[in-house]
Amino acid sequence: MTYKPPYEINTSILNKVAAIMKMIGKFSSMNNLSSQPLLIRKNQIKSIHSSLAIENNQLSESQVKDLINGKLVIGPQKDILEVQNAIKVYEHIQDINPYSQKDLLKYHKILMTSLVSDAGSYRKGQVGVFDDEKAIFMAPPTDRVPALMNDLYDYLNHYDENILIKSCVFHYEFEFIHPFSDGNGRMGRLFQTCLLASEEEFFYYLPVESIIKKKQLAYYDAISRSNQEGASTIFIEFMLDAIIETMNDTLKQSNIETGSLSIQAKKLLTVLEEGIPYTTIELMDRVGIKSRASFKKNYLDPLLQSGMIEMTIPKAPNSRNQRYIKK
């Protein structure tokens, strides 16, 4: 009999699945997301940065971008190595078979090479989550890990379930088992993405990790509450919400990439780095325009209206200290 982890499919989950299925239709009907290389690249940077930032990596999104582009980055060597390893994995993300334990071990080895001594192997010791010296969560005993992972992959490969739900269940159960000595969080998030993409390819290009990072406390709370309930239902609901939010954000971005912005606004957008505040003069210099009125009308205002950039002092638009940040 095929193993099934404990969870319930309630009305909330069904409604969220229905909402995602409706949005999948929108993705299918619009221009192929894979034909938008700038958006794909931007989202890949977000995925790598966010998944590692959740694990306390201190490098910024722009530093991750520089490493992807082969530039020199100054920072903690461990953090740089984590990003470099993640880049190697994400370069081959479409080659990953998420239904294979062999691939799980293979890509864990790439992700954690030179970071842990047992990269690519299940843990040999006990692990847990601690607050000071108090154990908040203790993972199952080491000798149970192989059997628990076999059960999880039995569910993954043989139980008939909607992939949206199944991928969330896998993510939660994987984190509960904590099969590796380190790297469990980033592997769980990566393999959920690969499971989703095995059904709908555009999921490769959705930075769900960025929403998880934004709601990191809620992410851990959903895991903790599911642990207490002994079922992954709460976590499934959280992750489905994260997927919905990511899809909405990506649809918005894709519409901008595919022509709803003027050529001038797109030009300004391409020369800005995310999270860096710019003055009006700096922005005008970047696009090579001298007329402040023309710049405001054709470049700046369309991006402000679309929500692609925002003011640092929105309540005082004309402030001399006003800066603009790409979101």
Model-inferred region functions:
Residues M1-K327:
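FIC/Doc superfamily catalytic core
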